[in-house]
A protein has these predicted regions:
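S-adenosylmethionine/decaboxylated-SAM
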Residues: 4, 9-18, 26-198
Length: 198
């Protein structure tokens, strides 16, 4: 484990990054990442939650996003993703925000869909018995979230932490109730399932 960083320092590094995570959620991710050496995040946006996890871990965060927007993002007429340059703007900002972590070898961006990333990482994760932590915050519609959850839950270590954001979204809550009914509530809208998932 690395030396603990003060809460205000974690927040000072994360909060300038555009995103939807509250302070208590960011600090929770930081604390969980301190226990993990291989983390996968699905749904990066501009890297706010990614930064919290990179600050906590001594290992690597695989940051998965295709930066094409989720169905709910694309349905929002006021979204940056509706502009012709939306994808490149958001992805460029994410890379700028994560550059220090990338340079340190703590963050590996995977610019691909969740499904492709799961297939790509499967042999890497199988060799080590699964990921220590997987954080799902990609698309929140029922079909997309079900696909993500079913794909990624196969790749978590038997003692790993499977968690995500926005448990109050109808698609997320419906799928969690169906697939992982023993999911616990974390701070804010964090959900988690801790170990014994296989």
């Amino acid at each position: 484990m690395i030396a603990r960083i003060a809460s205000d320092e974690v927040l000072n590094k994360c909060k300038p990054i555009q995103g939807w995570m509250y302070d208590d959620e960011l600090l929770w991710l930081y604390e969980q990442a301190r226990k993990a050496s291989l983390i996968v995040e699905v749904g990066v946006w501009q890297g706010r939650s990614t930064t919290a996890m990179c600050l906590g871990t001594t290992g690597i965060v695989y940051a998965v996003d295709h930066w094409q927007g989720s169905p709910e993002e694309l349905a929002n007429a006021h979204s940056i993703m509706q502009t012709g340059t939306g994808r490149s703007e958001v992805m460029t900002k994410a890379m700028q925000n994560l550059m220090e972590m990338i340079d340190q070898g703590k963050c590996v961006p995977l610019i691909m869909s969740s499904e492709r990333a799961a297939d790509f990482l499967r042999p890497i994760l199988a060799d080590r018995g699964g990921a220590d932590m997987i954080f799902l915050d990609g698309a929140h519609d029922t079909d997309s979230f079900r696909s993500d959850l079913l794909k990624w839950k196969e790749l978590i270590s038997p003692i790993g932490l499977l968690c995500g954001h926005d448990r109050h979204w109808p698609g997320v809550s419906e799928v969690l109730a169906e697939v992982l009914p023993d999911t616990q509530k974390g701070p804010g809208s964090i959900w988690f399932y801790d170990g014994g998932i296989q």
